Amino acid sequence: MNHQLTVKAAQLSHQGPKDSNDDAIGLHLPQGHGIASQTLAVAIADGLSSAEGGRIAAETSVTNFLSDFFATPASWSIKTSGFKVLEALNRWLHGQGQHYHNHHQAHLTTFTALVIRGQTAHVFHIGDSRLWRLRGDEWECLTNDHALSTRHGNQLTRALGMDWRIDIDYQEFNVEVGDIYLLSTDGIHQFIPPKELKAIVASRSETLEARCEELIACAESHHSDDNRSCQIIDIIDLPNNNQHLALDLQKSPPLPPELKIGDCIDDYIIEAELQANARSHVYLVKDLHDHKLYILKTPSHNLADDIEALQAFQREDWIGQRVHHPDIVKTYAPTRPRHYLYLIQEHLQGQSLRVWRKKNPHAPVETIIKFAKPIIKALRALHRRETLHQDIKPDNLFLTQSGCIKLIDFGSASVGSLAENLNLRAGAAEYAAPEYALGIARDGRADQFSLAVTLYELLTGHYPYGNDYKDCTTPKQFRKLSYTSACQYNPHIPLWIDAALGQALSLNPEQRYADLSEFLHDLERPNPHLTLKSKPWLEQNPLLFWQITCLLLLISNVIILFAWLKR
């Protein structure tokens, strides 16, 4: 049985004895299908009442966070989406405050947001609003107040709009069915003791709306002199796990039947079979609607019962439709209903770099280095969307007849928003960075390593760490490996290119380039500092070597002469 994210929620805000309400509350659970509909966002803010822009700051923060968060790229992780939105909000609020000479007109607000996707909660917090959780009989405040207690009351030490920099507390944890969450402003929790808060929130005989009203009334009975706002979220049901959230797709359609030339599938006529292997089948097809040629790709029938492989295929289609870049193969969104599982891509005429290398085993070094620029541009476009390709190799780099390089095949790709709590496997072990074999965190530097292996192979026909590399699975095994200079296999390779490859191929990701643009820079022009580091000491300082050698010979001759004279 498939379970969905199901919650009950209620919220209430009251101005209390004040002339205006500077608090803001909001929640959003999109309707429909896909990953967005399984994401709940709840936000609460308390505008600084001593600042005239406090109310605007609170309302803007809640409203814009709930709208902008769901408008971020689907490939971003929740953490990235939340931070990007809050950084933009903070810049705007801080900028508004700079328009005034009086600090009392600043736009300052506290902010606390709870985002739930699948079985995981994410919390973004700044200021002294609070998030509480009731789990069973355990009542816990999950946030820390960013405030100092003074004789004039609490003084915020952190708030949205206070500084152009922002310091947001972030945490994530598992959610359980039966959890109840309370978000409150200080007009509630500064006046109601924690035990009373717990008793009201835990009152199962009352509706959530009634509990919110009771919290407001209780704060008044405790002489709260501030605005009073609260939100209660009751977790009714959760997905079985996060796996089924991995794609923003409906239930997967069936695999198409075995296709042959002349067959028709959803108004695509099979013109030719281009490739067939254990993983997929690739066909050249003509669209009966626009009469253009396209590539139609389907999973192999061998994978009909392989859920992970079918998800990888869906992920390839999902990513391809959302990444648009001239150096990445175009994947087209459906223009009509699809009755089978397949994807449609642009028709590229040319060959993979694997085939090209077989035909050009002695290609000029500069020709191969020129391939790096479009590949790096494509990878940077992916990385900006928190997407790792994870299968960079000559087979997945396509050289068109016009001389352009296109990055293809996203079947092994990892996406920030989809990779949360998922362990996605990389592609070919010969090209994969050590992080995959060791099971440690990876980032764009893993793709950098794979690209460097690919360039090394195109230049030399060999692998940089030999054939044993793919079998390494432990740190000890990797430590036994040593990098073989590309110059040993191809004497036409300049030392500075070999040095750049060597750094990108460091087994320790911390020793690789921080950014792919730096790698490209060192591939295209000599980096004297890097080349110097990569040379043996003798090559770095030949004059000093011979000076020291002569000095040692002189000393040895003096010693011999002295010993002879003493006889």
Question: Where do the model's predicted regions map?
Answer:
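Protein kinase catalytic-loop region centered on the HRD/HxD motif
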Residues: 377-387
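Conserved alphaE helix
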Residues: 367-378
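C-terminal lobe helix-coil module of Hanks-type protein kinase domains
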Residues: 431-530
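AlphaC helix of the protein kinase catalytic domain
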Residues: 353-363
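Conserved HxN/HPN-centered segment at the entrance to the catalytic loop
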Residues: 324-332
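PP2C/PPM-type serine/threonine phosphatase catalytic domain
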Residues: 1-295, 301-315, 322, 336-342, ...
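Regulatory activation segment
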Residues: 405, 417-426
